[in-house]
């Protein structure tokens, strides 16, 4: 007996996104968004995962593209699910670079403490909720060492094991 009928859409409208919490000298990196629902709001940087791109590489790429900062994905902090989009929220380690706006997707880069960010009216609701949780618990799911035999560390990662 078949319980569910599923027909694969010819063109998927589902998106996979990433964003991240990056601390530099005790302050969190934010950008001021220039378009869409978050226009003129501050949020933690992120963006969409490209075809065949690992989410860890996507968040590192997005941070570099948007802020000129090189960072390394450390842990999965949280995951947001919507019917049309999934977003993985990472914690990241700072590697190098001076934070600056890309002048396109964002108009400003800010470094704020968690309390400074939470006190602002211009922060997105999602970033606010992530920070509220982060203030209470900074621990996420770390990347494991296991790599499937048919894969390499460049195209495989498992978290929490």
Functional labels for PLM-detected ranges:
Residues 23-28, 37-38, 50, 69, ...:
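Short, charged/polar surface micro-motifs in flexible loops or helix N-caps
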Residues 80-100, 110-116, 130-138:
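Active-site-adjacent beta-strand/loop module that shapes the phosphate/pyrophosphate-binding cleft
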Residues 1-19:
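Acidic, metal-coordinating catalytic segment for phosphate/diphosphate chemistry
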Residues 107-161:
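Nudix hydrolase/Nudix homology domain
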Residues 69-78:
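A short coil-to-beta-strand element that immediately follows conserved catalytic motifs
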């Amino acid at each position: 007996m078949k319980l569910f009928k599923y027909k694969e859409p010819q063109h998927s409208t589902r998106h996979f996104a990433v964003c991240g919490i990056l601390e530099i000298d005790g302050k969190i990196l934010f950008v001021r968004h220039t378009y869409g629902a978050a226009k003129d709001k501050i949020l933690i940087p992120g963006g969409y995962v490209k075809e065949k791109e690992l989410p860890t590489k996507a968040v590192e790429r997005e941070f570099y593209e948007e802020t000129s900062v090189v960072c390394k994905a450390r842990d999965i902090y949280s995951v947001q699910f919507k019917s049309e989009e999934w977003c993985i929220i990472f914690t990241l380690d700072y590697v190098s670079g001076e934070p600056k706006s890309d002048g396109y997707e964002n108009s400003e880069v800010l470094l704020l403490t968690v309390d400074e960010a939470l006190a602002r009216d211009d922060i997105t609701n999602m970033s606010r909720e992530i920070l509220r949780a982060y203030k209470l618990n900074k621990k996420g799911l770390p990347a494991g060492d296991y790599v499937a035999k048919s894969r390499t560390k460049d195209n495989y990662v498992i978290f929490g094991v």
